[in-house]
Structure formats: structure tokens, C-alpha cells
Amino acid sequence: MFEVTDDARIVGYRPLLPPAILLEELPLTEHASHTVTRGRRQAEKIIQGEDDRLLVVVGPCSIHDTKAALEYADHLQSVVEGLQNDLLIIMRVYFEKPRTTIGWKGLINDPHLDGSFDINNGLRTARRLLLDLAHRGLPAGTEFLDVITPQFMADLVAWGAIGARTTESQIHREMASGLSMPVGFKNGTDGSVQIAIDAIGAARHPHHFLSVTKQGISAIVSTAGNPNCHVILRGSNSGPNHHAEAVKACAEATSKAGLGTRLLIDCSHGNSRKDHRNQPTVAGEVAAQVAAGDRSICGVMLESHLVEGKQNQSSATPLVYGQSITDACISWTQTVPVLQELAAAVRARRAAG
């Protein structure tokens, strides 16, 4: 009698929608393609030091309500024109959430917030939102966590991120080497910048790895390498790394590795000591460095939503509209002065030559 040696801990399989079917249902339009391409090209120029503006990735910690996300997008779009000479604003649109242990893994994994894990619907909802944003002329940025999800939506993403928990992962470095947009790698949760530097070096090179095609067929993927990757300083469990000394040390390390000196600073997470109320202060300190002439800082990240703070998921209590269910965010009204301060810093740096 044979022993069970395969799938011993698998409790079921469900069909996954092939990427090509979703792209047929919700196709990239000409207008959307212009939004995405413009965002990518401008971000690349900023990362390469050919554009002196700041790249600002701003938006909710995670997306759980597309109606609120679109309302936030409309607010953001209303300030873009007045700031576009100094800032390239990309909306943070995160559909996948890495968890330290367990918890809600994001809109793609559980779009109904009820443990039904309707992933096909989650992918469809995510792509529809990205299309809506692109049609508004607003480029989007997201974290790539699952290495298959780019096939469903990467054509609508202007800037991508690899999180602190996955920067050291070989498959994420390989994936980044084939992504069509600039990609930021965060320093590790322990504060190590070297793993992000190593990741950028790896992602610049061609790779060959296992993945799936748009038709959902298993394939060996060969990539060309991604020349537009950069470090994201996000602080760590032991404290911030957005101050001038840490920025200088990171820029020197990336330069020594032959990767340029440009980096982006996350004003949340370890840099805010996990207190959203500190984000404006962190952004102000970063702005001061920019105004003083620092040219290694090419951008910032902000976690911002319609309503300040965060809330817990509970079936017994209705969710507050426009408030995060993951990390706490600053409110929209708190966000606008931060954006204005960053824009003023760029003008000051520009004026100083």
C-alpha cells in the first residue's frame, strides 16, 4: 500500500483566472497607457538624476475600499497641477500586505474582508481600480508581494516596491529584474541597507526563473535586468534612518557598489517609530535636507488616507469610511501641507544651484 507523499497538507484547489482573460475583460486603453508610460519615464529620470523634482509616493497603507480610494485619488489629483513643477506625485495603491505573523493579506487575497479569499474577484477589483486611476491621469505605485500578480496588473503600474520582508528574497529580485517600471527595495526590518543594495545589484542583471505566462501556463522566464532600481530607507525596529548621517552613509554605499547615489525615504514605519503622527515631522526633516542641497534624496513615501488613524476589522462594527484597516495614516488635510513643504524644499534646492 502506497503512503501519501504529496499534497498531505493541501485542503483544496480552486481555478485561478488566467491573466490573459482578465486583461481581455479590462484592457489597457490608449489613455491609460499614456498615464502609465509618462509616470514611469518621469520617475526614471528622477531616479537617474536627470530631473530635480522629488518623486512622492503617497496614499493609503492598503486599499480595502475602492470607493474611498477613488475619492482620495480625486483629492490628490486636485493638487497635482499646482505641485507638478516640483513633485512627481504617484498614488500609493497597495493590494498585497505582508504580515509579520497572520492577518488580512490585502484586497487581492480577501477582497470581501470576510475570509472567503475570493482571489479572482480581488484581482479583478485591483485591476479595475488601477484602470480608473490611469484614466484620471494619476500614475499608481504598488508593492509586488506575490510573484504571479504582476501578470495581472503590472501594465498599469508606474512604480513598484519590494518590501522589507522580501528584499532579501531571490525570487523577488528576479521578478524585479523583469518588471517594466522603476522598483524600490526597502532596507531590512533589522535596518540593514546592504540587503537592499545587494538586491538592486541582482535586479540589474538578467535572470532565468520559473513563472507563468499571460495564458497561465508554467514557463521559464528570461529577463533583461532592470536599470531603474533604488533603495528605500524605511527605518527599522531599532529606530529611524532618515537623518542626514544615515542618508549620507547609504549614498556612499550605493555609490561604492556602482549603483549611483539616489534613494527614497519612507516617512512611515521605522522612520516614524510606527506612529503616524510623526510622519509630517519626518517629512519636514527630509525636506530640510533637500532644501539644504542634498541631491541623493530623490523621493519620499507617505501613508495617507481620507481619515486619520486606523481601525480594527470587526464584523460587529461598521468600518469608518476612508480610514485604514492596516497601518495608521495621516489624514488628507494633514497631507496637503506636507506636500507643499516638500515642493518648497525642491524650489530651495533648485535656487541654490
PLM feature segments, named:
Residues 7-47:
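N- or domain-start disorder-to-order transition segments that initiate the globular core
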Residues 59, 265, 331:
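Conserved, mostly hydrophobic/aromatic
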Residues 47-50, 80-84, 128-137, 223, ...:
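Acidic (Asp/Glu)-rich catalytic clusters
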Residues 234-236, 241, 249-264:
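A contiguous, surface-oriented mixed alpha/beta subdomain in the mid-to-C-terminal portion of proteins
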Residues 305-350:
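Internal helix-turn-beta structural module
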Residues 55-68, 327:
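Conserved phosphate/anionic-ligand binding catalytic regions in large, soluble enzymes, centered on
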Residues 2-6, 73, 86-247, 269-270, ...:
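Active-site-facing alpha/beta catalytic cores
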